[in-house]
């Protein structure tokens, strides 16, 4: 009897797949559209840390589906590449002087080695790297298309600048904390600073970015996050004249019905009209206030907890309907980057306005009430209701009716109009760094921008000695004079020295996979039409707003220009749950690194002070020393064990804690399959109940893979394997289809068993997914309740009459049971045949 030598088996088949290019895919025109599928992973940033066990979760899910589809006769595109521009490599280069390209490519080789060790079915001939000049040539080409369409422009604007990173950050890359704003990467302090920036007009696509969410199969939570980020609101834009001035102030409001209750206007301190309208005697006070407030973060200025502050400008606006004079203030809680940078303040019907009016003793005029009567207001009434204290034609009407009539009046009298507003801001697209795509623009002495010609692409990064940004905040490229200065037609131009953000390369990489070696086009129309859109995209929920929104924006631009054939890039999106790890917390809630923890009598203690610690579930992190390295797992248990364990831990979309005990159970499961292989292989007919069990398992595994319910598919395989172990022989008519349905989960073992049965490799080229016969499926199952200390923790379907030992084995490996008995002593296990199992612990 041979042993299950997973190391030898896995190396053998990985070498075979590489040598024979088993997973190379071509655009076979004879394969109909319904038999093609594009399955995509969010490609990784190749960090120096390599993979931890959380990374392959999504990759394993797509790999199982890929192999399943191959066995069902599909042409499957399943590529992999690397999002290889980025700050970490540049920061390391600043510290060491080593070129970011060299660092990045070394990291990529480590990533590839780890990914290949897990046996994923990638077509490596389609690998892309965003830092490769043959790739970023086309990123630059897309930028030029955006520029020529009027969607890329230069603007001096207040931006988030991080001195430690030496670059500008987009709003999405800044985290608001109680201690002020910080960079998402590195958690460094950031500040507001006016800088010349390239900006992309994503706002032009705001409505379509919302509307087209209806056409795609994405998690509702992600759709809501995108809708909230875009922040659509419908209302009116109203124009207020200014007393004794030709200037006008535009205000956006979602409640035009409350215009009769406006008692003051508030402008953002940075509003361009402030200096023009401020009375001379107040200019010093206003200037001091502006200087102080502009340095604050948006969150600090708009926080509901913060005290609202403001200063009167001395100027007055005129209410366009009532013609009342209204004082104009500037206030911290109004931001220049949102709406028009001005608000009409109705303290009777808005909480912030109410608070501000109370503080500065400004009038409060009620114009809406629930009953239609005047009421004593102790707090603002912010709901819809009945209009009061308004001109006769607007009085005693419901809110929606008043809104309509006010907008009609404003439009007729040219004082305003109906308006849709978006919270979304244009995308700051430039970075003051070296390690990014150069922007293909040159600039003359008059600051006119001249785009490079397409035959001048790629504009390559020059070699430089120092990767640190200049003291002025400019890119390191600004110091390379022989690169910056360009002579044309006897004139000297300067190159744009900002580079693109890391998001640029990931906005379109899914298209380049279709045609990665094309030197004439970013991808041929034939290949785009053959594969697009991406049928399934799997990645983390942390990309819900940033990458996914930006990629949708670029795709829509390319669609409008006729370069792609679909309005949306990703048909279906799945967010895999996070794989967490155990961490340890002291009595003050402080997390203690794992290497400072010792275990004694099923309890955990600090090595430093011997105090007992609480075991909790936390995100894997270097600081907590709780990262699990897949290399170690593969070495001890094999890639197939790790793959199956990650899928068996729980539903794909759930977060779940890593537990090596569960992995050991999976390793035993694969050894059981090997034990069946070691039995006498016979062509005899199997018993009726075995055949029935096989067809039932095929049905369950097929349905579960289609629905990405991998954990329950594995569970049904386990149940059937346990039944097969009871028999002395290995029936070929059972083992062959069983091997095929096992192969997507454990591809190395699947190939080995396929070859053992005398079949020609690869199983993924030469086998066909078995079909179940409904007539052979006998309903021989029961729902078993799993309890811990009498409380229901889960329910599972098992074969009727399952023996007690098998039931105990399955229950103790169940994810929810394992969570509930972790670090507890099992006193006894009570079973009621075909009904329940109760695990009693203390």
Curated annotation (Swiss-Prot):
InterPro entries: aa-tRNA-synth_I_CS, aa-tRNA-synth_Ia, Leu-tRNA-ligase, Leu_tRNA-synth_edit, M/V/L/I-tRNA-synth_anticd-bd, Methionyl/Leucyl_tRNA_Synth, Rossmann-like_a/b/a_fold, tRNAsynth_Ia_anticodon-bd. It comes from the Bacteria. It is an enzyme of class 6 (ligase). Belongs to the class-I aminoacyl-tRNA synthetase family. It is found in: Cytoplasm. This is Leucine--tRNA ligase. It comes from Borrelia turicatae (strain 91E135). GO terms for molecular function: aminoacyl-tRNA deacylase activity; ATP binding; leucine-tRNA ligase activity. It catalyses: tRNA(Leu) + L-leucine + ATP = L-leucyl-tRNA(Leu) + AMP + diphosphate. Its main location: cytoplasm. Pfam families: Anticodon_1, tRNA-synt_1, tRNA-synt_1_2, tRNA-synt_1g. Its EC number is 6.1.1.4. The gene is leuS. ATP binds at residue 622. A motif ('HIGH' region) lies at residues 44-55.
């Amino acid at each position: 009897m041979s042993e299950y030598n997973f190391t030898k088996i896995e190396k053998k088949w990985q070498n075979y797949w590489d040598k024979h290019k088993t997973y190379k895919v071509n655009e076979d025109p004879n394969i109909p559209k319904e038999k093609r599928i594009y399955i995509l992973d969010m490609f990784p940033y190749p960090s120096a840390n390599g993979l931890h066990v959380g990374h392959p979760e999504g990759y394993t899910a797509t790999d199982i589906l890929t192999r399943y589809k191959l066995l069902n006769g599909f042409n499957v595109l399943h590529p992999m590449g690397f999002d290889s521009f980025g700050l970490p490599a540049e920061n390391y280069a600043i510290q060491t002087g080593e070129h970011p390209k060299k660092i990045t490519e070394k990291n990529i080789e480590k990533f590839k080695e780890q990914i290949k060790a897990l046996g994923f079915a990638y077509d490596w001939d389609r690998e892309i790297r965003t830092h490769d000049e043959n790739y970023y040539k086309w990123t630059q080409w897309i930028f030029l298309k955006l520029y020529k369409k009027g969607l890329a422009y230069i603007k001096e604007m207040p931006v988030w600048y991080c001195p430690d990173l030496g670059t500008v950050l987009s709003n999405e890359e800044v985290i608001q904390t109680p201690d002020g704003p910080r960079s998402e990467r590195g958690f460094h302090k950031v500040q507001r600073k006016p800088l010349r920036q390239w900006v992309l007009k994503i706002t032009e696509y705001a409505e379509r970015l919302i509307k087209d969410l209806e056409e795609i199969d994405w998690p509702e939570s992600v759709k809501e996050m995108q809708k909230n980020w875009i922040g659509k609101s419908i209302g009116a834009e109203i124009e207020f004249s200014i007393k004794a001035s030709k200037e006008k102030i535009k205000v956006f409001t979602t409640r035009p019905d409350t215009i009769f209750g406006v008692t003051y206007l508030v402008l953002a301190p940075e509003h361009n009209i402030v200096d023009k309208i401020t009375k001379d005697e107040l200019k010093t006070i206003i200037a001091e206030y502006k200087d102080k407030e502009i340095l604050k973060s948006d969150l600090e200025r708009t926080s509901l907890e913060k005290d609202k502050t403001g200063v009167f400008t001395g100027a007055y606006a005129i209410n366009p309907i009532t013609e009342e004079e209204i004082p104009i203030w500037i206030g911290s809680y109004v931001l220049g980057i949102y709406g028009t940078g001005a608000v009409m303040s109705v303290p009777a019907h808005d909480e912030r306005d109410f608070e501000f009016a109370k503080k500065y003793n400004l009038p409060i005029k009620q114009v809406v009430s629930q009953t239609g009567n005047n009421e004593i207001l102790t707090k603002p009434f912010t709901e819809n209701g009945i209009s009061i204290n308004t001109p006769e034609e607007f009085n005693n009407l419901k809110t929606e009716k008043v809104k309509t009539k006010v907008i009609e009046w404003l439009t007729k009298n040219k004082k305003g109009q109906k308006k849709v507003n978006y919270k979304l801001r244009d995308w700051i697209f430039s970075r003051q760094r070296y390690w990014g795509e150069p922007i293909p623009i040159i600039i003359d002495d008059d600051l006119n921008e001249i785009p490079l010609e397409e035959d001048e692409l790629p504009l390559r990064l020059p070699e430089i000695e120092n990767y640190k940004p200049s003291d002025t905040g400019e890119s390191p490229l600004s110091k390379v004079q022989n690169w910056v200065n360009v002579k044309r037609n006897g004139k000297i131009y300067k190159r744009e020295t900002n580079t693109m953000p890391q998001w640029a390369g990931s906005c379109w990489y899914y298209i380049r996979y279709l045609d990665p070696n094309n030197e004439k086009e970013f991808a041929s129309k034939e290949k785009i039409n053959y594969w697009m859109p991406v049928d399934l995209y799997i990645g983390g929920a942390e990309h819900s707003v940033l990458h996914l929104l930006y990629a949708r924006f670029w795709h829509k631009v390319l669609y409008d220009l006729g370069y792609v054939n679909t309005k949306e890039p990703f048909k279906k999106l799945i967010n895999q749950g996070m794989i967490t790890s155990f961490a340890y917390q002291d009595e003050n809630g402080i997390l203690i690194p794992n290497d400072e923890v010792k275990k004694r009598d099923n309890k955990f203690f600090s090595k430093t002070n011997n105090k007992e610690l609480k075991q909790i579930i936390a995100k894997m992190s270097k600081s907590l020393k709780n990262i699990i390295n897949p290399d170690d797992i593969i070495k001890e248990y094999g890639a197939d064990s790790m793959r199956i364990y990650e899928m068996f831990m729980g539903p794909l979309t759930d977060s779940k804690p890593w537990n090596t005990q569960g992995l050991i159970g999976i390793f035993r499961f694969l050894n059981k399959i090997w034990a069946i292989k070691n039995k006498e292989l016979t062509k005899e007919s199997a018993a009726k109940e075995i055949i029935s069990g096989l067809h039932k398992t095929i049905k369950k595994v097929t349905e579960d893979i289609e629905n990405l319910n991998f954990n329950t598919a594995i569970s049904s395989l386990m149940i059937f394997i346990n039944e097969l172990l009871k028999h002395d022989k290995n029936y070929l008519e059972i083992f062959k289809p069983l091997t095929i349905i096992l192969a997507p989960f454990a591809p190395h073992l699947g190939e080995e068993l396929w070859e053992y049965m005398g079949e020609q490799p690869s199983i993924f080229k030469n086998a066909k997914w078995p079909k179940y016969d409904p007539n052979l499926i006998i309903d021989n199952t029961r729902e078993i309740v799993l309890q811990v200390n009498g409380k229901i923790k889960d329910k599972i379907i098992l074969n009727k009459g399952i023996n007690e030992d098998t039931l105990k084995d399955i229950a103790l490996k169940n994810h929810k049971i394992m969570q509930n008995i972790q670090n507890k002593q099992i006193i006894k296990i009570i079973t009621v045949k075909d009904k329940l199992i109760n695990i009693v612990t203390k």
